[in-house]
Amino acid sequence: LPEQYLPVFNSNLIEIYMHKIPDLSEQFVYFNDDFFIINHLSPKRFFEDGLPKDIAAFRTNTGLSQYERMLQNNIRLINKHFDKKEVFKKDSWKWLNPSYGKRARLNYLLKYYNKFITLRTPHNAQPFLKSTFEDVWKNCENELKEMSTHRFRSNKDYTPELFKTWQICSSNFIPYNTYQDTKMFPLMIKSKQAIKAVREQSYTLVCLNDNIHIRNYQQTHENLKKSFEAILPEKSDFEI
């Protein structure tokens, strides 16, 4: 991160500079701190023929929350640089892929609508190409430099979904329904389901989304810890 933008208290800002990490591979996977692998996983889950595996499916966006307003900022940039008709004409099989199931219903309904809307993003590990970040910066440098002055989160921010959507609109992805083996558990309302899913390894990837309002936080934390210890009894090299 350029020194003139420090100190930073805005994770969105840090994320738009991910490609600057020294020795970062062209193919990389971005994990937030609440994402966990709980089952066997191979690189093919994230990449095929050198391209990220992802779902290209629209979702509704009310713009009521700050996060949704940020997603709308992303889409305004996408519509500035991509022609939806041309993208769909070139890649209709990627957007209307049967593997998406009912999650692609808006794709069919909006097939002839001229503009992109917000894409679905499962709250879990996201595969990227470093060259995608470089391409976005090349084309949107002014907007991203302006955002770099936002030391704290702002309604005018962009998010990593900008890079995911750019990647998809550039046809740099392989269709894959990422919902089939991932699950997000808000621990405030689904702590028991989360503990059970970890212990039974019901998914490949889970997001354990916590917050300060979780009831019986200490007990929930302890039960999750026991579930992880049951499936991962040996310490990794990292922990030794």
Language-model features: locations:
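Long, charge-rich alpha-helical interaction segments
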Residues: 52-148
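Active-site-proximal specificity loops/subdomain of glycosyltransferases
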Residues: 1-26
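Short, flexible loop/turn elements at secondary-structure junctions
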Residues: 1, 22, 32-35, 167, ...
